[in-house]
């Protein structure tokens, strides 16, 4: 299935991180802290400004981003894979 976000929305696949406890035990699943880094899978056309022009997004497909998993983030399953649909405003940084 293809998915195309609208306007300033971005589709992100969460990147898994390996968490280790203070005692050296590798934590997985619900015991591990969820990553706030992800890979951009798709981007919308851009934010519509008050004057009607469209400002392109600052991120592109393939970028690794740090995001804020707040109120506006929507979790979806696409082809059996969990993805996040969020606004560009929920992105905090691009990791180079």
Curated annotation (Swiss-Prot):
GO biological process, one term: chaperone cofactor-dependent protein refolding
GO cellular component: cytoplasm
Molecular function via GO: ATP binding; metal ion binding; protein folding chaperone; protein-folding chaperone binding; unfolded protein binding
Membrane-traversing stretches: none
Pfam families, alphabetized: Cpn10 (PF00166)
Cellular localisation: Cytoplasm
The keyword Cell division is annotated on this UniProt entry: no
Gene3D superfamilies from the UniProt entry: GroES chaperonin
Keywords: Chaperone, Cytoplasm
NCBIfam families cross-referenced by the UniProt entry: PRK00364.1-1, PRK00364.1-2, PRK00364.2-2
Family indicated by similarity: Belongs to the GroES chaperonin family.
PANTHER family in UniProt: 10 KDA HEAT SHOCK PROTEIN, CO-CHAPERONIN GROES
Subunit annotation: Heptamer of 7 subunits arranged in a ring. Interacts with the chaperonin GroEL.
HAMAP family, per the entry: CH10
Function: Together with the chaperonin GroEL, plays an essential role in assisting protein folding. The GroEL-GroES system forms a nano-cage that allows encapsulation of the non-native substrate proteins and provides a physical environment optimized to promote and accelerate protein folding. GroES binds to the apical surface of the GroEL ring, thereby capping the opening of the GroEL channel.
Name of this chain's protein: Co-chaperonin GroES
Organism: Shewanella amazonensis (strain ATCC BAA-1098 / SB2B)
Lineage summary: Bacteria, Pseudomonadati, Pseudomonadota, Gammaproteobacteria, Alteromonadales
């Amino acid at each position: 299935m293809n998915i195309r976000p609208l306007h300033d929305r971005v589709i992100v696949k969460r990147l898994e991180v390996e968490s280790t406890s203070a005692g050296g035990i590798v934590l997985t699943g619900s015991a591990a802290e969820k990553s706030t880094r992800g890979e951009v899978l798709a981007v919308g056309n851009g934010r519509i400004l008050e004057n009607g022009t469209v400002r392109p997004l600052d991120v592109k497909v393939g970028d690794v981003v740090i995001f804020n998993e707040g109120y506006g983030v929507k979790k979806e399953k696409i082809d059996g894979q969990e993805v996040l649909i969020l606004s560009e405003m929920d992105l905090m940084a691009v990791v180079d």
